Structure formats: C-alpha cells, structure tokens
C-alpha cells in the first residue's frame, strides 16, 4: 500500500480497529462504507496489467474430461497426456466429469455462504490469526507492516492426515464440510495416480510418499466492493501446496498469469479447477523438477457479489512433512539435473510468510545456482 508521512500510525490504527471488530470485510460492507479503508488499497504495480494483453488473442484454460478415467485403457492414457501438457504449460486446468456429485458441490457453496452471512457474534468465536489453529475465521491472517489487505473473508479447516475433530467445524456448515472433504480425498487419490503417471512414475508413487495426505479447506467469501479498482480479492501469488482443487460459484474473478498475460478463468458449473502448487514444481520431494509448473494467480475484487469459492489445498502428511526429501532419481539425469535443493515443508512455508508481499513465490530462494562452463 502507499504509505504517507503519517502512514505508519494510520496503517497500524486502521488494522487494529478492523481486527478488533472481528467482523471481517463483510462487516465493513454491512456498515455501508462507500470507500475502502486505506490499508486495503494496493499499489499501482500490484493492480497493473502485464506488458502483454489478451485483447487480440483469446486464451482459454485447458479443459480435461475425466469421464471413464478409472476404467483404464486408451481413455486414461489420453487424460494422462492432457494432464502432462496442461501441468507443464499452464500449471492449471479445468476438470469436468470428475465424479463429485453436483448436489454436494452446491450444498458446500451454500454452506460457506451461510457461515459468512450468519450473525457476527457467532463468527467472532473463531476469529484468529494463529496459523496453528486448525479451524479459524479471518480475512487476511497476519500481515507484515504496510502490506495491503485483500478484500475477502476466509473460514479455514485443516485436516492433518485426513483427520479433524468434527466438533471443531462450525455447526452451520459441519455436515457439508465433512461430505465435501470426503469427495476431495477421493479426488486426491485419482489425481495422485494420474499425476504420477504423467511424470512417468508408477501410479502409486505420489500416494506412497504421502505428499498430499493433509488438506486445508479455504472457504472464501468475497463481498461486493465499493472501489474494486483499488484493491484485490486475492493478491498475486502461487500456492505453497502440492496441489489445489478449486470450486467457484458463478461470479468469476479468478485470473492466472500465462505467458505474461492475465487470463480470465470463467466459472463452469460443476467443474473443478486444478492447479499445481510450489511443492509439486520443486520442493518437498522435488517431485517434478520443473516438469510441472506452479503459476501465479489472483482474484479481482468485484462490484457485484458475494463471490463464493472453496479451495482444497493438499499438503504432506505430518510424517512426510517432517522429513527432507531429495529429487527422485528416476527423473534425474546429466541432461536433467536437480534444480532445487532439499528442504522441509515448514522451512518453505516459514520463508514464504516472512517475505509477505515482497515475494509471490519462494521457489527462487531454494533453486540451485549453477555456474556455466
């Protein structure tokens, strides 16, 4: 954000007042504001469009049809090849006919809306910026001084090794969260097989190393914004995960950075969006060694809304996350050496958090520097 001469005091004051309400961004909207608080204003370079534009070129996210993928045969091989191409070129792809029932998806979106639109007194009980709290409600989590806040509220539910005490989940969305996570775990198993095969590994490889054994469910609520041109729903970033599966409603606003162009990802009812995380690209087990890419993306603030989305972030099991991993020997060679050093999952996350908005990906920090002969 832009910091004026007395900006230090103003930033701290506004942030403190906002946090103390424990009402989130929706609380500001409900109060009838016509201008957004200064700490939500993003610098021009953050809002700017890259040098290239999509005015003359229509780019469209790859869509992959999973129909019959579990029966094997030529259809599965075709899907694996499509995933390999999309993950290596785009880092994102849309999935249709994935097997998650539409009524469960709709119920989950409605439950998220119901949670965020309940009385503030109910949500306050979960308001926290403590990253160790497995179920919490907040807007941005801990921000570094002068970082710009994003125009959204989040309910987060973290399942370590697929487990979370049901009583910890808010009653207003408990049933829907449990049912949706079951579907996400089933999708994870399918995706783990297909991604393994796309990397040229045995289909059980990713499952065996437990690199996606935990889930963090981010239930996002993007309220209508009175000045959407000044802020963002979610700032530019890449995911500090292994894989993310996203469900979004009909509002839209998601953009991915492809070939230095912001590409809109319009909603498709019943579809899921898969995106490769930083850990898939290079960290944790250094699985893909840049065969797959984790790309930056953002969500625009909107003059309409609310926009509802649910992101399921897959991360390592507690056991796998506690160990450093080396590059997989099967995909390394003299021509294809390791690109990143070993590191722990927590080491990556800690570095990412310390950099705040100064970095959209922590991958360069762990890349091996090579001196050319």
Where are these regions (language model features)?
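Peripheral, non-catalytic segments flanking oxidoreductase cores
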Residues: 1-373
């Amino acid at each position: 954000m832009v910091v004026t001469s007395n900006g230090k005091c103003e930033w701290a004051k506004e942030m403190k007042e906002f946090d103390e309400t424990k009402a989130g961004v929706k609380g500001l909207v409900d109060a009838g504001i016509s201008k957004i608080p200064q700490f939500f204003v993003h610098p021009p370079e953050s809002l700017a469009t890259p040098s290239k534009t999509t005015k003359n070129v229509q780019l469209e996210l790859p869509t992959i049809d999973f129909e019959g993928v579990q029966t094997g045969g030529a259809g599965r091989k075709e899907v694996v090849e499509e995933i390999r191409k999309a993950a290596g070129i785009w880092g994102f792809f849309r999935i249709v006919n994935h097997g998650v029932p539409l009524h469960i998806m709709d119920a989950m979106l409605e439950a998220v809306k119901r949670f965020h639109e309940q009385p503030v007194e109910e949500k306050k009980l979960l308001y926290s910026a403590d990253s160790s709290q497995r179920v919490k409600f907040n807007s941005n989590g801990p921000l570094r001084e002068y970082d710009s806040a994003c125009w959204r509220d989040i309910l987060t539910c973290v399942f370590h090794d697929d487990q979370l005490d049901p009583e910890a989940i808010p009653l207003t969305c408990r049933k829907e969260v449990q049912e949706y996570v079951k579907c996400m775990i089933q999708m994870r198993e399918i995706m783990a097989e297909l991604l393994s095969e796309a990397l040229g590994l045995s289909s059980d490889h990713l499952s065996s190393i437990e690199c996606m054994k935990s889930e963090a469910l981010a239930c996002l609520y993007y309220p209508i914004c009175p000045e959407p041109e000044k802020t963002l729903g979610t700032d530019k970033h890449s995911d500090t995960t292994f894989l993310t599966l996203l469900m979004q409603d009909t509002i839209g606003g998601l953009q991915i950075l492809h070939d230095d162009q912001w590409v809109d990802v319009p909603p498709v009812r019943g579809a899921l969006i898969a995106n490769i995380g930083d850990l898939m690209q290079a960290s944790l087990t250094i699985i893909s060694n840049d065969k797959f890419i984790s790309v930056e993306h953002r969500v625009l603030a909107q003059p309409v809304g609310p926009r509802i989305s649910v992101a399921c972030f897959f991360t390592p099991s507690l056991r796998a996350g506690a160990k450093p991993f080396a590059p997989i020997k099967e995909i390394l060679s003299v021509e294809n050496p390791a690109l990143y050093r070993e590191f722990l999952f927590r080491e990556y996350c800690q570095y990412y958090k310390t950099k705040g908005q100064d970095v959209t990906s922590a991958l360069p920090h762990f890349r091996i520097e090579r001196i050319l002969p």
